[in-house]
Amino acid sequence: MSEYTGEVVHGGPSDVRELAHLTIRKASVSEQDNNAYLLTCRATGEQLLIDAADDPHRLRALVDEGTGWLDAVVTTHRHWDHHRALADVVEHTGARVLAGAQDADELPVPVGERLTHGDRVTFGEVELEVIQLRGHTPGSVALLYRDPEGPAHLFTGDSLFPGGVGNTFGDAVAFASLVDDVEQRVFATLDDDTWFYPGHGKDSTLGAERPHLAEWRARGW
């Protein structure tokens, strides 16, 4: 298997990263380059999908690339482009539905588990930590996997990208909230080798982005 790069294109194949206890599959599922991530517990085969963003047929194929069944779907935030296929995926898989508490009522299906900062999400023998990053939306959540045999892995939705935090649409209060949370809850607590996976586009590491934090705050976006 080729080395994981995180570079995927709409209509193209998944990129796959094999960790000791977890397999991560990344696929681009829309013309907006929305990323969907399928996480598979290697011990039990149970699976969790992050953001059923679009293209239900592609997402079903992604699930089949793993073990073929889906246990849970987490929606990172309320924006329409991150849950266009959620209703279809839930209908066809029966997966449990999780989302940030403040965004849950905006989703097209009932949310069974409303997530808040510090919660844990488990599937199989895998545990993810919930990090609320307030600003892009009130209920935006990131999911952290602490690999016992390597660097941490962080799924950030639209709250953190290579080159800056997520869009806060000119709202200075929301921007301050987001950049504060990203600094305090991500960069202040996690190591530089933490790999993060955003809701659109390419991945990065915290070490690559850390030198630019003051620049992001100063420019205001």
What residues fall within each predicted segment?
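Short glycine- and acidic-rich boundary segments immediately preceding or forming the N-terminal edge
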Residues: 1-16
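Conserved beta-strand hairpin/beta-sheet module of binuclear metal-dependent hydrolase folds
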Residues: 13-68, 142-157
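Short beta-strand or tight-loop elements
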Residues: 20-22, 124-129, 139-141
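Short Gly/Pro-enriched turn/cap motifs at secondary-structure boundaries
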Residues: 27-29, 112, 132-136
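Short, well-ordered secondary-structure micro-motifs
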Residues: 37, 60-61, 108-111, 143, ...
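Divalent metal-coordination and catalytic microenvironments
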Residues: 39, 51, 77, 89, ...
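Active-site HxH/HxHxD metal-binding segment of metal-dependent hydrolases
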Residues: 44-47, 54-129, 151-152, 212-219
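Metallo-beta-lactamase
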Residues: 68, 137-221
